[in-house]
Amino acid sequence: MKIAILQFGGTNCDQDVLHVLKDVVGVDAETVWYKQEDLTGFDGVVVPGGFSYGDYLRAGAIAARTPIMNSVKKLAAEGKPVLGICNGFQILTEARVLEGALTTNEYPKFRCHWTNLRVETVDTPFTSKFRKGEVIRMPIAHMEGQFYAEEKTLAELDENEQVVFRYVDENGKVTDEANPNGSLENIAGIVNTSRNIFGLMPHPERASESILGSDDGLRVFESMVDYITENF
């Protein structure tokens, strides 16, 4: 098993993800510079956070149009898992492999703090180690994290159980106060209809060891690895 961690100009969370996969989970992982393009031999992809290309045009817009993303789409078409974290989520929406868009936070400032999330579905390659309805903690760090989608798309996401995480209070209740960026329906992360592409704004790699304040995020990577082990 080998997992690719993409690097674009401005990516800055790649080494954190590499550490979690190699040193905490214990699987083979490798950073892949965007010019490499070919992802043959990899069983999964992580598109990590950062500020790819300085967030020029829109966050993720330039990275989404690099040739390596064609290889990501090809890998996903084979059923292999693709995880997009923060800027990675933005890139995946810009690449049109996930629904919706991430726009400037409702209160336009950079938000960097812990959030409570409610697990909405465990029927994905990334959440099999969670319990539906449990409240977990992960930090956010973004300026453009407000999830937006048209009403019809939101209804489809809910109907198909594609919403994976929502921002909630410590008791698991969806409230405006618990929503850090104005995301519609407090959405923090979604999957595609095939369920093997997952994007989220919170950072699971920053919550993968108890010394950091939470290890809830570790289960995202462990679930992904279990899925690869069982299917590829």
UniProtKB/Swiss-Prot annotation:
Keyword field: ATP-binding, Cytoplasm, Glutamine amidotransferase, Hydrolase, Ligase, Nucleotide-binding, Purine biosynthesis
Active site: 86, 203, 205
GO biological process, one term: 'de novo' IMP biosynthetic process
A cellular component annotation (GO) from this entry: cytoplasm
Reaction catalysis annotation: N(2)-formyl-N(1)-(5-phospho-beta-D-ribosyl)glycinamide + L-glutamine + ATP + H2O = 2-formamido-N(1)-(5-O-phospho-beta-D-ribosyl)acetamidine + L-glutamate + ADP + phosphate + H(+); L-glutamine + H2O = L-glutamate + NH4(+)
InterPro entries per the UniProt record, alphabetical: Class_I_gatase-like, PRibForGlyAmidine_synth_PurQ
Pfam family, one: GATase_5
Location(s), subcellular: Cytoplasm
Biochemical pathway: Purine metabolism; IMP biosynthesis via de novo pathway; 5-amino-1-(5-phospho-D-ribosyl)imidazole from N(2)-formyl-N(1)-(5-phospho-D-ribosyl)glycinamide: step 1/2
Entry-linked SUPFAM superfamilies: Class I glutamine amidotransferase-like
EC numbers, comma separated: 6.3.5.3, 3.5.1.2
Residues making up the signal peptide according to the UniProt record: none
Broad class of the protein's primary localization: cytoplasm
Residue span, Glutamine amidotransferase type-1 domain: 2-232
GO MF entry, a single one: ATP binding
Domain of life: Archaea
HAMAP family: PurQ
Subunit architecture: Part of the FGAM synthase complex composed of 1 PurL, 1 PurQ and 2 PurS subunits.
Its job: Part of the phosphoribosylformylglycinamidine synthase complex involved in the purines biosynthetic pathway. Catalyzes the ATP-dependent conversion of formylglycinamide ribonucleotide (FGAR) and glutamine to yield formylglycinamidine ribonucleotide (FGAM) and glutamate. The FGAM synthase complex is composed of three subunits. PurQ produces an ammonia molecule by converting glutamine to glutamate. PurL transfers the ammonia molecule to FGAR to form FGAM in an ATP-dependent manner.
NCBIfam families linked: FGAM_synth_I, PRK03619.1
The protein's name in its UniProt record: Phosphoribosylformylglycinamidine synthase subunit PurQ
Organism: Methanosarcina barkeri (strain Fusaro / DSM 804)
Organism placement in taxonomy: Archaea, Methanobacteriati, Methanobacteriota, Stenosarchaea group, Methanomicrobia
Annotated gene: purQ
